[in-house]
Structures are given as structure tokens and as C-alpha cells.
Amino acid sequence: MSGIRLIVGLGNPGPEYEKTRHNAGFWLVDELCWQFKGNWRSEGKFHGDVARIQIEGQDVWLLKPMTYMNLSGQAVLALAHFYKILPDEILVVHDELDLAPGVARFKQGGGHGGHNGLKDIAARLSSPAFWRLRLGIGHPGDKKEVANFVLKKPRAEEQQALDEAVLASLRELPRAVSGKMAEAMKALHTEAK
């Protein structure tokens, strides 16, 4: 398998969304950028903030779309097209209602599960074959509460569990980047429960 060349963190721009559950993808790529001494810069042609880092000797692009969640695919397509990055070389990091806080899972392809960011990316890439890193945020219990729930800050114990899942995920990203996704999946799925 080829490795990951683009890691996209999903979220919404602006200070009012910064600490909300829906911005879990931003949290992970911010930490990744910091750990690997990258520098974010706003890039209009890619509709977002971008950074380039090196992991395991390979260049990896980081992207935070500034289009708001529902139009994330616009930014992903622009960068992927410009650098000739294939869908299976893209890892999209996003909040996941169907996993408890503290649980993180890699997955390739599949549906969008009602996540509008994933839906837009799959539509614009004309493929759902990109990789996902699903960061559990839990579910409010009532489907009608979802929109409100994802745009609120997690409780303190949930935030701690999310932070631990982010760190566990970051430990496995070098394997994912170097094309050892099966190993990364096994390690993460065993560790981040």
C-alpha cells in the first residue's frame, strides 16, 4: 500500500468553534504540526491553512479547510489535485458520534454516516476511498440533539479522553505515512479503547 501524503483535519474556522466537538480533526492536525515543527500558513488557492512536515523522511501535507465543515471537499480537492495526491493517500481526521470519547479508529472508505464534511469530500473527490481517522466524541442519545451537541465543548472528562485518543493516534501516524496501515490500525485499535 502507498503511504499517506495528505492529512486533513476537519473543523470549522473561528474562535467560537475552536473548542467544540466538531473541531476534533483540527485539534489533531494542530498537535501534529507542532510535534513535527511545521508552520501553518493561509493558502487561498487551497481554501484553508496548510503546512508541510516530514514524517519518516516523507513530505506530508497538513490541511485545515477554512470553508466550514459542509464544504470541506473544496479544500481537499484543490490541494489533492494540485499535488496529484490520490484518494487512498489521504487521511481525513474527524469527529465520530458512533464512538465513545477516547476511542480512535482508522478506516478506509465507506459511507459518510451523516457527517457532512465526509459527504462533501467523497462527492468532490468522486470517491469514498480515502482513509479516515475517526475520533470518538460520543452521541447525545437523541438524533435531534446532534447538531447542537457537536457544536458544544466536551465536558472535562470527555476532553481528557479525547486528548488521550489524539495522542494515541499521533503515535501511529508514522506507520500510516510509511504505508503500514494494517500495523497502525492494529496498534491503535488495541490501544485507544
Swiss-Prot record:
Location relative to the cell: Cytoplasm
Assigned GO CC terms: cytoplasm
Residues where tRNA binds: Y17, Y68, N70, N116
Site note Stabilizes the basic form of H active site to accept a proton, residues: D95
Major subcellular location class: cytoplasm
UniProt cross-references to PROSITE patterns, sorted A to Z: PEPT_TRNA_HYDROL_1 (PS01195), PEPT_TRNA_HYDROL_2 (PS01196)
Pfam families: Pept_tRNA_hydro
Keyword Zinc-finger: no
Reactions catalysed according to its record: an N-acyl-L-alpha-aminoacyl-tRNA + H2O = an N-acyl-L-amino acid + a tRNA + H(+)
EC number(s) recorded for this UniProt protein: 3.1.1.29
Molecular function per GO: peptidyl-tRNA hydrolase activity; tRNA binding
SUPFAM superfamilies, sorted: Peptidyl-tRNA hydrolase-like (SSF53178)
The entry's keywords: Cytoplasm, Hydrolase, RNA-binding, tRNA-binding
Highest rank taxon of the organism: Bacteria
NCBIfam families xrefs: pth
Functional note: Hydrolyzes ribosome-free peptidyl-tRNAs (with 1 or more amino acids incorporated), which drop off the ribosome during protein synthesis, or as a result of ribosome stalling.
Cross-referenced HAMAP family: Pept_tRNA_hydro_bact
Name of the protein in its database record: Peptidyl-tRNA hydrolase
Protein's organism: Chromobacterium violaceum (strain ATCC 12472 / DSM 30191 / JCM 1249 / CCUG 213 / NBRC 12614 / NCIMB 9131 / NCTC 9757 / MK)
This protein's encoding gene: pth
